Amino acid sequence: MNNLKAHYQKTIAKELQKSFAFSSIMQVPRLEKIVINMGVGDAIRDSKFLESALNELHLISGQKPVATKAKNAISTYKLRAGQLIGCKVTLRGERMWAFLEKLIYVALPRVRDFRGLSLKSFDGRGNYTIGIKEQIIFPEIVYDDIKRIRGFDVTLVTSTNKDSEALALLRALNLPLVKG
């Protein structure tokens, strides 16, 4: 079992139950899934960019990503509906906990000039999105093998609909959020 998951089950869940006065342990907010999304605008011109993005996302997440298609046609970008323009992967269970642990303790400390994550990234429904500017902060990515530095979004989806409960959960999981 993952260290972070064991810590959540043994201590964090009980602490959150006491602090929010939940009558049942099942009411305690928990992490449901992590969605990693990478938009590849260059895939319009050359599909090799999408292939390299799929490979990088596979290395980072440990799970095969799925290519995403454009919903609408946008003539200014020469984009047609149904054209492949990105990739995403949804992590649940053990892979989710392993990725979160790697993100918190390995990747985020490698970000240059890192001062913590903003509290403004909550969506109002208890979900938190982190924008990562460079994929090279992950140890699986070899700097010499990448064609282009690209970023991606990591969305932490929680079981609660309140940002305050999700904030307490993420702070308890040691996500480096800015004091506020």
Curated annotation (Swiss-Prot):
Superkingdom field:
Bacteria
> This chain belongs to which protein, by name?
Large ribosomal subunit protein uL5
Family affiliation: Belongs to the universal ribosomal protein uL5 family.
Sorted alphabetically, the keyword list is: Ribonucleoprotein, Ribosomal protein, RNA-binding, rRNA-binding, tRNA-binding
Q: Does the keyword Methyltransferase apply?
A: no
User: What HAMAP family does the database record attribute to this sequence?
Assistant: Ribosomal_uL5_B (MF_01333_B)
Spell out the molecular function terms from Gene Ontology: rRNA binding; structural constituent of ribosome; tRNA binding
**What species is given as this protein's source?**
Mycoplasma pneumoniae (strain ATCC 29342 / M129 / Subtype 1)
The protein's job, in short, is:
This is one of the proteins that bind and probably mediate the attachment of the 5S RNA into the large ribosomal subunit, where it forms part of the central protuberance. In the 70S ribosome it contacts protein S13 of the 30S subunit (bridge B1b), connecting the 2 subunits; this bridge is implicated in subunit movement. Contacts the P site tRNA; the 5S rRNA and some of its associated proteins might help stabilize positioning of ribosome-bound tRNAs.
Q: Which GO terms describe its biological process?
A: translation
Q: Which Pfam family, just one, is annotated for this protein?
A: Ribosomal_L5
Q: Which Gene Ontology cellular component terms are annotated?
A: ribonucleoprotein complex; ribosome
Cited Gene3D superfamilies: 3.30.1440.10
Q: How does it assemble?
A: Part of the 50S ribosomal subunit; part of the 5S rRNA/L5/L18/L25 subcomplex. Contacts the 5S rRNA and the P site tRNA. Forms a bridge to the 30S subunit in the 70S ribosome.
